Amino acid sequence: SLGPTLAVEDDMEPNRWTAELDQLAWERDIVFVVAAGNDGNQHPDSGLHRVQVPADMANAVSVGACDAPTPDRPWARAPYSSMGPGRPGSRIQPLGVQFGGVDDRLFNVLRSDGSFLEASGTSFSAPVVTHALADLAGRLPRINSSVLRAFAAHFAERHRAYKARQDELGFGRLPLSFADALDCGPDEAHVLFVDQIARGDILGYQLPVPGTFSSAAKISVTLAYASPVEPTQPTEYTSASLELTLRPHRNIFRFSPPRGSTEKPRNVDLTSTEARTLLTSGWTSSQEPVTKTLTSAASLNEADLRDSGKWETLRHHRVSFAAGEINDARLELRYFARRAGALDGSPTEVPFAILVSVSDPNTGGTLYDEIAAQFAALRPVQRVAGRVRLRSSRQNAWH
């Protein structure tokens, strides 16, 4: 919580605090948790209501304030909490919110003399989130900064008006603890992929949906990665883009009609009689199974892709499938880079984390067991209590 009263500006170069800390986060694999600022009650026309530097970082966790702690409901943005959008490369700012105190329910702060101080501000909500992420880091067998950012966005509690208030609340109210997220119920499974990708490579990851599963399914996917930054490029600040593609069914391909035909392309099961009939009639099939759109891009041109999050370092998607629409589904990841607005071909590697949740809305009670039986390579995270050293006048004690 640095305290500069400087709101993000789209057409200006990033503040030095923002650029330096972003580059440090990229080079040293550090996650900074930053208070979003306390000017959210400024008039929107002034622009002063937006998140304050360095909360506009692309590689950090920026935290706003809400008016009620978890699990109290209803909850909303605290009136003073600064709002998004952030700068290009990290438009969803703050990443999320947590209780920071409001006039009729202040935040209790313990003074060094043992007395309490009542206050409010994002400078109090940010340390609460820092504590939760630090505890999570001690529970996971393998972490990097991207893992922590992915968990924060993935398990945020969505507001009932999530889309309409995303500039206010980001991905939602952030957890006080991630311990429960490490325990899956019988109708769900959470799987974490931690890897790195070189420019030009394509990586594939099979989604943990068992072949015997014939029910409807809900899938949540969060991608987080660290990116080098270009401090002199206000609108092209992040240099790396990881393109995420979902292919839900191994046998569903795109069939195109013969040249000159007036018929439209169609998606057909490659193993079906219809597919064989089309092929003998001169139709051609795609080389890869069809994809499921994860973004809201209106088209494939660069402007629409950029607006839909192509260069954002943190993305969260939720998709639903009817029974039979998933078969050996996989995610594919491709890495692009740019420099000064043009595609860059110099070799680099980008570390990333993908967090996937699969749930059965019909509550059949067998999904987790089926996943564990089919995907033997997956290992459940062991619950470990973090050890904390307390300093006292007598001796150091571990608890």
Regions found by a protein language model. Give the residues of each.
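Subtilisin-like serine protease catalytic core
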Residues: 1, 27-29, 57-59, 86-93, ...
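Substrate-binding/access-modulating region of protease and related hydrolase catalytic domains
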Residues: 1-55, 118-120, 124-126
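Generic beta-strand/beta-sheet core signal
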Residues: 3, 33-35, 63, 97-99, ...
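Acidic, glycine-rich active-site loops and adjacent beta-strand->loop/helix elements
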Residues: 6, 36-40, 66-69, 102, ...
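Extracellular S/T/G-rich loop segment that most often corresponds to the catalytic His/Ser-adjacent loop
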Residues: 49-134
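C-terminal subdomain of the subtilisin-like protease fold in secreted/lumenal serine endopeptidases
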Residues: 138-218
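Extended low-complexity, serine/threonine- and proline-enriched intrinsically disordered segments
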Residues: 218-303
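C-terminal edge strands of extracellular/lumenal beta-sandwich accessory domains
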Residues: 237-252, 267, 277, 294-296, ...
